[in-house]
Amino acid sequence: MSISGTLSSYYVDSIISHESEDAPPAKFPSGQYASSRQPGHAEHLEFPSCSFQPKAPVFGASWAPLSPHASGSLPSVYHPYIQPQGVPPAESRYLRTWLEPAPRGEAAPGQGQAAVKAEPLLGAPGELLKQGTPEYSLETSAGREAVLSNQRPGYGDNKICEGSEDKERPDQTNPSANWLHARSSRKKRCPYTKYQTLELEKEFLFNMYLTRDRRHEVARLLNLSERQVKIWFQNRRMKMKKMNKEQGKE
């Protein structure tokens, strides 16, 4: 009987153990875990708990939740950051200056006009233009008239054969321009007017050689220089000699 009782108890225990494998928490009640872990907590009670001071958040607004339509395509670790629309706190203002520069002309509502600084604008090279400051010319009317009188053509500009050059001189600093635009240094030839030529021809027929006083008087009457009258008479005598030679050969 003892053997049969032992076997029956063995079979009963094996059946009960197999059935209880599916639910292991039922085998050990929750009271055992609580009683076993309580001594562990009691061992660390002699150390004081650490107290940390709460710090201000760096950014004003918290992380916004991800939209449902975009959460499916992004991994679970990714947290998008949406720029807050509100005014940041005073502690984080210095961190946002490089992110969002404030306009130059605007100032904080608490500041006065002393904080606003008008910055000059760069115009042409070497010039500074200020905003909102009109420019006034200090030039007087007398100075303007003097400048205009200097720019007006004078009597010397209307003179005939005043020694103006053929064309404007090229750039003296550029040797290639001097070589390409090389011209003679002779002055521009100023022809005499018909009236001047007629009067000189009359004087030449009357006398081929002029005295100094007569040359001075003719130059004054015809608005010419004495040198011009002298050269004209020399050329006219050479032309007359040439015509006489041609007539003698014929």
From Swiss-Prot:
<comment type="function">
    <text>Sequence-specific transcription factor which is part of a developmental regulatory system that provides cells with specific positional identities on the anterior-posterior axis.</text>
</comment>
<keyword id="KW-0804">Transcription</keyword>
<keyword id="KW-1017">Isopeptide bond</keyword>
<dbReference type="Pfam" id="PF04617">
    <property type="entry name" value="Hox9_act"/>
</dbReference>
<dbReference type="InterPro" id="IPR020479">
    <property type="entry name" value="HD_metazoa"/>
</dbReference>
<dbReference type="InterPro" id="IPR050803">
    <property type="entry name" value="Abd-B_homeobox_TF"/>
</dbReference>
<dbReference type="InterPro" id="IPR009057">
    <property type="entry name" value="Homeodomain-like_sf"/>
</dbReference>
<dbReference type="GO" id="GO:0060326">
    <property type="term" value="P:cell chemotaxis"/>
</dbReference>
<dbReference type="GO" id="GO:0000785">
    <property type="term" value="C:chromatin"/>
</dbReference>
<dbReference type="GO" id="GO:0006357">
    <property type="term" value="P:regulation of transcription by RNA polymerase II"/>
</dbReference>
<dbReference type="GO" id="GO:0006351">
    <property type="term" value="P:DNA-templated transcription"/>
</dbReference>
<dbReference type="GO" id="GO:0005634">
    <property type="term" value="C:nucleus"/>
</dbReference>
<dbReference type="GO" id="GO:0090575">
    <property type="term" value="C:RNA polymerase II transcription regulator complex"/>
</dbReference>
<dbReference type="GO" id="GO:0009952">
    <property type="term" value="P:anterior/posterior pattern specification"/>
</dbReference>
<keyword id="KW-0805">Transcription regulation</keyword>
<feature type="region of interest" description="Disordered">
    <location>
        <begin position="149"/>
        <end position="182"/>
    </location>
</feature>
<dbReference type="GO" id="GO:0048704">
    <property type="term" value="P:embryonic skeletal system morphogenesis"/>
</dbReference>
<keyword id="KW-0238">DNA-binding</keyword>
<feature type="cross-link" description="Glycyl lysine isopeptide (Lys-Gly) (interchain with G-Cter in SUMO2)">
    <location>
        <position position="117"/>
    </location>
</feature>
<dbReference type="GO" id="GO:1990837">
    <property type="term" value="F:sequence-specific double-stranded DNA binding"/>
</dbReference>
<feature type="modified residue" description="Phosphothreonine">
    <location>
        <position position="133"/>
    </location>
</feature>
<dbReference type="GO" id="GO:0000978">
    <property type="term" value="F:RNA polymerase II cis-regulatory region sequence-specific DNA binding"/>
</dbReference>
<dbReference type="GO" id="GO:0005654">
    <property type="term" value="C:nucleoplasm"/>
</dbReference>
<keyword id="KW-0217">Developmental protein</keyword>
<dbReference type="GO" id="GO:0045944">
    <property type="term" value="P:positive regulation of transcription by RNA polymerase II"/>
</dbReference>
<dbReference type="Pfam" id="PF00046">
    <property type="entry name" value="Homeodomain"/>
</dbReference>
<feature type="region of interest" description="Disordered">
    <location>
        <begin position="21"/>
        <end position="47"/>
    </location>
</feature>
<dbReference type="InterPro" id="IPR017112">
    <property type="entry name" value="HXA9/HXB9/HXC9"/>
</dbReference>
<dbReference type="GO" id="GO:0000981">
    <property type="term" value="F:DNA-binding transcription factor activity, RNA polymerase II-specific"/>
</dbReference>
<dbReference type="GO" id="GO:0003700">
    <property type="term" value="F:DNA-binding transcription factor activity"/>
</dbReference>
<keyword id="KW-0832">Ubl conjugation</keyword>
<dbReference type="InterPro" id="IPR017970">
    <property type="entry name" value="Homeobox_CS"/>
</dbReference>
<dbReference type="GO" id="GO:0009954">
    <property type="term" value="P:proximal/distal pattern formation"/>
</dbReference>
<comment type="similarity">
    <text>Belongs to the Abd-B homeobox family.</text>
</comment>
<dbReference type="InterPro" id="IPR006711">
    <property type="entry name" value="Hox9_activation_N"/>
</dbReference>
<feature type="DNA-binding region" description="Homeobox">
    <location>
        <begin position="185"/>
        <end position="244"/>
    </location>
</feature>
<protein>
    <recommendedName>
        <fullName>Homeobox protein Hox-B9</fullName>
    </recommendedName>
</protein>
<dbReference type="InterPro" id="IPR001356">
    <property type="entry name" value="HD"/>
</dbReference>
<feature type="compositionally biased region" description="Basic and acidic residues">
    <location>
        <begin position="159"/>
        <end position="171"/>
    </location>
</feature>
<keyword id="KW-0371">Homeobox</keyword>
<keyword id="KW-0539">Nucleus</keyword>
<keyword id="KW-0597">Phosphoprotein</keyword>
